[in-house]
Amino acid sequence: MDAFFAAVEQRDNPELRGKPIAVGNEGHRGVVSTASYEARRYGVHSAMSSVVALRRCPQLIFTPVRMSVYKEISEHIHSIFHDYTDVIEPLSIDEAFLDVTENKQDIELAVDIAKDIKRRIREELNLTASAGVSYNKFLAKIASDYRKPDGLCVIHPSQALDFIARLPVEAFWGVGAVTAKKMHSMGIYNGAVLRSYSKGGLISAFGKMGAVYYDFARGIDDRPVVVDRERKSVGCERTLEEDLTRRSLLSVHLYQLVLELVERLRRGKFEGNVLTLKVKFSDFSQITRSRTVAQPLTSKTRILPVAKSLLADIDVEHMAVRLLGLSVSKSAAGFHRPVAVQLELDF
């Protein structure tokens, strides 16, 4: 979807159409969740501090997040997808991979399915969507972002290598700011230069992701579309009302986060044995600390001591804390579940 949350707000509030808006909290502690395309022209983007966003775009209009509305629309969109295929891998509330090699409508060309889905979303929901069509997930994702908003891009196998050659490395999946900077230091600015490196050379520079970059530069991505992907983690976070350095106050917020996390775990019927603490500082730098335990983390009594221990290992006195986050995930080795044993009683 195109600037999904912001597009919904502009659809439902005609006075906001054509204006720069941000979905999120306008307060000095606020963060932009989604920015409209009008706002993006000023350099406003998601995860940006509201203060910085307003500095870049003084006329920016903030609207509150209405997650229940967005989820309902997302469900409608997925119902449209299911009219064509059940091989669907959701990536987020507004994005998914579809494998339409075999489809319910017996439509021969994938591009025609993409056109039909875009048409139905426009007619049924009055929203625009962008679609990418190609022979693997890497290229389909690149294509979907290529002509936003309301775009449709097809990358045919015969065109793939030329397309990738011109692609800046920042557009490659798995290449963030740090990796891009390292690639630039090696003289790698696009797919053509990336392709000139050996697999061994890329692995030496980037670890196991080097092999992935090697394949991507050659248009290779063998990942299948995974239906009903198992949820890997459950978490929650909160931006504090003011930056804090006092551990006693941070402990209060940590306790409240633990209670919220326990409730989310209960609702999601999720069990895991790895607890991760995320701390974002006032300069927007962040660190994470994780701990693996033997038994599932499902209750306050199990999670709170681990959370406190993780926080104790982080220096918060020299840099004020802006945000705390907690999440539970599953370790690769799994966890031990105590076995109930019936005791024998002598009478």
Range-by-range predicted roles:
Residues M1-A205, G210-A211, V328, A332-H336, ...:
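Gly/Gly-Pro- and Ser/Thr-rich, intrinsically disordered tail segments characteristic of DNA damage-repair
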Residues A171, T179-L323, K330-F347:
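DNA-contacting surface of Y-family translesion DNA polymerases
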